């Protein structure tokens, strides 16, 4: 009999017992000493909720829009690579769960299911494409064109990965894809991170990034991408207000405040702490989203109160996959949805439009006096 899991931490604890160690370590780990990994979650507790009373919360509407597309709730699925390591159906299970729940899924370029397979598995699902900029621009260009052809609704371009962060567990485990898997959006063994490729004796993914991803990425590449596609473009990985303003100048449609799940540069701020500066900097000109550390419905409420349009979750989806595939992902999303609904009700919010910054304040005890 399967255990009864009632919160996101339950799903993670279960995943640790069923996933191969190198796979669990890959999904769980952050960069270096993992200070930011812990802080992404811990930082939410530094923001305190100040609920409104006597607001008639008999009926709660969680729905909103993301880049002009309606979603049932402001909780979407972020790009998580190589999901077939967690469950045989991987990304196909995830997109089906998103379709059922009425929310969106961002597909990783490094998926173990192809752009086309995911579109066919979730034809009615709201799908977005995450993009890395490859040294060979034609590789990135083809990913964008395929996403357009298959009905994906936006491109989320990752800008925080000129090189891969130093993830100690991946080095210790000499992380590679299991032999039966490959990144299915690519044909050649080298681009597909196939076990048949040559990726060294340490972290194979770090070697892959060094071989394939362009470290000379600049704002000119955002212009190139803007010329390439008419789809909305979201820049993923912004943590500074001036970078956010530069992104707006270059014609992006959204900014995803992200530190890559704390997997790139250790010591950067938790995303919830970086969010207010970004929101202020863009002055409402583009939509702002957040990922990193979202584990509870109150986390979602706090992010929206600080100006996020929606949040994206990554690791919780993997833990759901590891538990029960499509149903596990759906259950994880349902938990977050119902926690968010309750948090809204207890805060006096009938719909997402009334969620504003008056609902949250930084705990004064958490502010350094240095």
Swiss-Prot record:
Catalysed reaction, written as an equation: a (2S)-2-hydroxycarboxylate + O2 = a 2-oxocarboxylate + H2O2; glycolate + O2 = glyoxylate + H2O2; glyoxylate + O2 + H2O = oxalate + H2O2 + H(+); 2-hydroxyhexadecanoate + O2 = 2-oxohexadecanoate + H2O2
Function of the protein: Broad substrate specificity (S)-2-hydroxy-acid oxidase that preferentially oxidizes glycolate. The glyoxylate produced by the oxidation of glycolate can then be utilized by alanine-glyoxylate aminotransferase for the peroxisomal synthesis of glycine; this pathway appears to be an important step for the detoxification of glyoxylate which, if allowed to accumulate, may be metabolized to oxalate with formation of kidney stones. Can also catalyze the oxidation of glyoxylate, and long chain hydroxyacids such as 2-hydroxyhexadecanoate and 2-hydroxyoctanoate.
Protein name per UniProt: 2-Hydroxyacid oxidase 1
Tree of life domain: Eukaryota
Record text on subunit structure and interactions: Homotetramer.
List of residues binding FMN: 79-81, 108, 130, 158, 236, 258, 291-295, 314-315
Source organism of this protein record: Rattus norvegicus
Family to which this protein belongs: Belongs to the FMN-dependent alpha-hydroxy acid dehydrogenase family.
UniProt xrefs under Pfam families: FMN_dh
Gene name per UniProt: Hao1
Keywords: Amino-acid biosynthesis, Flavoprotein, FMN, Oxidoreductase, Peroxisome, Phosphoprotein
EC numbers: 1.1.3.15, 1.2.3.5
Microbody targeting signal, short sequence motif: residues: 368-370
